[in-house]
Amino acid sequence: MPFRTMLFAPGDHARKVEKVFDAGADAVILDLEDAVAVSQKPATRALVREALQRPRPNLGYARVNGIETPFCYGDLAALVGPGLDGVILPKVETPDQLKTIDWLIAQLEAERGLPAG
């Protein structure tokens, strides 16, 4: 489904996360990376997961932390599930990094009984 508008919002601001899906964008991207302090990353994952699981009129994506960080796996493990339409992966430097993330998402989907993709 093509979309014209994307709205990014920091995933650690409960009020913004609550309202962003009603702003009229075709897709919403909740940011877990640069906008979130290290100490807030676990709580942000939970907030974003809950927001993505609610009914909404648009696509819901998460911008996770880069594969070279210690946070990427935790982000994916927390978020791959119902309601997540896709992942925005920052700072990809090689095709192998993208293949690794694709493989990891596929494994999490299979473990959780979700359809691939």
List the model feature ranges, each with a label.
Residues M1-G117:
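Expand to "…catalyze enediolate/carbanion chemistry for C-C bond making/breaking, isomerization
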